[in-house]
Amino acid sequence: MTFNGFAKRFVIRDAEGMYFVPVADVDRVEADGDYVAVIAGGRHHLVRQAMHVLESRLDPAEFVRVHRSHMVRIERIRRVEPCGHGEYELTRADGIRVTSSRSYREQVRRLLR
């Protein structure tokens, strides 16, 4: 299912079958080996898909990629602090901190405009 060309939900497969995770519930996305962890409501849902594929399915007005291994929901970012060398530390509403990489500094700087 898509909305404006972007995913509205993720289909998660596990040993018991399939279930859905609405994109509206997703807090962040992290690379996890050959999988991507879709984190929603404190639960990690593993998806066997490349990070760049998942990124293309998410609305860039709602999610920003800040590192090769991390994407975060923009509305849940509470603080951005420069760390030097083009890196930033982003603090989310739940207190979790994610450090951006230099490769994604422009994406973080756009958040600050």
Indicate where each model-derived feature is located:
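Conserved binding/recognition cores within well-folded domains
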Residues: 1-93, 97
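Phosphate- and divalent-cation-binding pockets in alpha/beta enzyme and binding domains
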Residues: 107-108
